Structure formats: structure tokens, C-alpha cells
From Swiss-Prot:
Keywords: ATP-binding, Cytoplasm, Kinase, Metal-binding, Nucleotide biosynthesis, Nucleotide-binding, Transferase, Zinc
Pfam families, sorted: ADK (PF00406), ADK_lid (PF05191)
Region annotation LID: where it falls in the sequence: 126-163
Cited HAMAP family: Adenylate_kinase_Adk
UniProt-annotated stretches for the region NMP: 30-59
Gene name, Swiss-Prot/TrEMBL: adk
GO cellular component, one term: cytoplasm
Organism name: Bacillus anthracis
Family: Belongs to the adenylate kinase family.
Protein known as: Adenylate kinase
Length: 216
């Protein structure tokens, strides 16, 4: 099963990725991990990426796409994979189609975890972190026993500056605009599957499981 996982910040992608790879024993391939592994292994594309990163420059698409090709050609991807964080643009998605064709494979589903932006705002702005031990809480979903006090060490809880409402709303807005052309591209190809991410975590996975179970 060859899957792409999409969703806005706060949609719960990480949690669902963990459950998918645990049940179906396929590699979870995130962009960051892919780059780190390629640079560590000193592959041709990894060395090229490192030369750009060391200069503080953006890694060009052709290098990123080369790293994706290297990674998807590895033995652990024979039974499938879960791609997370790539592609980000229609150009990258088109390049991925070419890679899959060359490898004699196809993308089975693009799973988009769908959550209303108002609910995402609530999820993302409710996070609080302990100044002393770094424990993470959420005002609605995982509140401390005593307001603004860490259950573990009694430290003061604070909101990170990039978790404030205006910053989060801007971040979501940018993500929505960037993601829409990609979702349209995959809908046209017939790969896109919308998953209701507003449900309980286990129910979200149950819906994904029903969808992809037949691919195993």
C-alpha cells in the first residue's frame, strides 16, 4: 500500500501515522527523516542537499525529488510506504507520479485528515507548556488539575508565542492556500480520500483502517 498523508497543523497526522505504520508494518517516510538519512548515508542526492543546507540555502526541487526517488527505491518500501510532508506542491506531485511510474508502482490513496479550521485554532491555541520540566498540557483536552500549574513539578505553565491566536490563524490560512491546489490535483487523479478528523482518535483510525485494509 502506497499512501500519502495530508492534513493541516493540529489535524492529528502524527497520531494516525503511528497507528498506520504499527498495524501495516510499512515505513513512515517524513521529509525531515528522509533528508537526514540521505545526508548521513552520503548518497549522491544527500551530499547535494547538504551543500545547500550548509550554505543556508533552500534545497531545490530536483534534489528533494532525487532524495524521494532514492528513498522509495529502498527495500523496505517494496510492500508500501506512508509519505508525510511530501509532496508540498503540484510540481512535486507530478514528479512523484513519474517516480512511481519508473518504479512500476502507483499511489493508492491520499488520505486528507479534515478538521474545521475553527476547531484547529482551538486545538493549537490551547497548548500550555511547563517552564520548569517542559511537560505539555491542553486547556481543553489535557488540562492540569490546577490552572496554570504543572501536575508533575508544580512549575508555571505558559503559552508559546507562536501558539497565540493571531499567529496560529495566519499559519492555518497560509497552509490552506498552499494545500488547495495539491488536493485538487489528487482529486482529479481519483486518489483523494477525505477522513473526518473531528472524531475520537480511535474512530479516525477505524475509518482509515476500513479504507486501506483491502490494500494489505
Amino acid at each position: 500500500m502506497n499512501l500519502i498523508l495530508m492534513g493541516l497543523p493540529g489535524a492529528g497526522k502524527g497520531t494516525q501515522a503511528e497507528q498506520i505504520v504499527a498495524k501495516y508494518n510499512i515505513p513512515h517516510i517524513s521529509t525531515g527523516d528522509m533528508f537526514r538519512a540521505a545526508m548521513k548515508a552520503e548518497t549522491e542526492m544527500g551530499l547535494q542537499a547538504k551543500s545547500f543546507i550548509d550554505k543556508g540555502a533552500l534545497v531545490p526541487d530536483e534534489v528533494t525529488i532525487g532524495i524521494v526517488r532514492e528513498r522509495l527505491s529502498q527495500e523496505d518500501c517494496v510492500r508500501g510506504f506512508l509519505l508525510d510532508g511530501f509532496p508540498r506542491t503540484v510540481a512535486q506531485a507530478s514528479a512523484l507520479e513519474e517516480i512511481m511510474k519508473d518504479l512500476g508502482k502507483k499511489i493508492d490513496y491520499v488520505l486528507n485528515i479534515n478538521v474545521d479550521s475553527g476547531l484547529l485554532l482551538k486545538r493549537l491555541t490551547g497548548r500550555r507548556i511547563c517552564k520548569e520540566c517542559g511537560a505539555t498540557y491542553h486547556l481543553e483536552f489535557n488540562a492540569p488539575a490546577k490552572a496554570d500549574v504543572c501536575d508533575k513539578c508544580g512549575g508555571e505553565l505558559y503559552q508559546r508565542s507562536d501558539d497565540n491566536e493571531e499567529t496560529v490563524a495566519n499559519r492555518l490560512d497560509v497552509n490552506i492556500k498552499q494545500t488547495k491546489p495539491l488536493l485538487d490535483f489528487y482529486e482529479e487523479l481519483g486518489y483523494l480520500q477525505s477522513i473526518n478528523g473531528e472524531q475520537d482518535i480511535n474512530k479516525v483510525f477505524a475509518d482509515i483502517d476500513v479504507l486501506i485494509g483491502g490494500l494489505a
